[in-house]
Amino acid sequence: MSTVSGGQVPTDTRFKIVSRERLRGTAARWRRFGEPVPAGGSRHADGTPDYGIFGPGSVVWEVLLHPATIVFQYAFQGLLQSTYKPVVAGIRDRDPLSRNARQGTITFFDIFERGQRNSGMHAPMWLGDTETARRMAKHLHNIHRKVAGEVIDVGRPELGGYAASEPRDAMWAALTEMHSMLWLYESFAFRDGGLPHRLTPDRRDQFMAESAAYCRLVGAPEDEIPTTMAELSALYDKYHDLFGASETLTIYPDTGDDFAKLLADGMRKNFHRSQLPALINAIVLDHGLFRQLALGGSSGRTRRSAGLGPARAGLAVAGTKLSLPLIWLLQRGPFERHYMRLMWGPDGVRLIESARRLQRASSA
């Protein structure tokens, strides 16, 4: 078993205790720079409403605001980003999860809270006015400037290094968020009185064209931003080597320890019964059942990148199809409201509800 940095063992065990209030969190867990201004809550210099980077009537909002997306967004995003090697390398080397694992203080709550903050901290960029989106993007860019390293994978030194705030990795962070959201909608969103189904090719291309604004917001290279599904597919082909499973990806370049093992061993060692709700939400649901369902609802390329062979991929697809009644149930009102507050936070709830009112009005 790997040892914690310096061989120290934490003596204060209060970090293990997770109250109901700590689990739910207050607005401060997600909020930066004060309460976010919702899309349409301010005006441009010419007096027209400022709807931010997307706005009512957009295909992105159609996809994002569906109850299925609210419930399953993190599971799908986490799946696709776990196949992009620079993201995994950044978590391994620079994420608070890694720091806590090395210090011996990692808990199931840490895994839960990281996922919990994810959706809610993106909501201001997707559902806020332009200034709100820019300020949150700048904040995340400044944080990600520290997420850089010279080695993506010790087993594949030819891959080079990573830098989360630089154009390539910033672009793929945005694209994996948006593309996984589209899969989610097409695979899980019951709508139009029927089963989940694909958008038309024109609507899919429109989704990508609208997503370009988000890529620009985070600093993606203009000459590579895809505006159609065909361009996105070509981009995946170009960066093929940066996607996929690897047995050495979680190895720390400096010590040779295995981050994944250190994480798992530390969470087991530091378990306290008060962490059970966090364990259920993070491990059993988000990284367990929901992730498995997402595998069946994603692309064949992603299933291959996740290490699934033909047999396991077929089982994943079949399992997701057989689970459609459960998927339908989880996007009903009580369940969606629970996940919205838990995973998007109070500000996220307000942004979603405000955007839904605008979206309904745009289609009336």
Give each language-model segment a name.
Residues S2-A364:
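Mature, function-bearing regions of proteins
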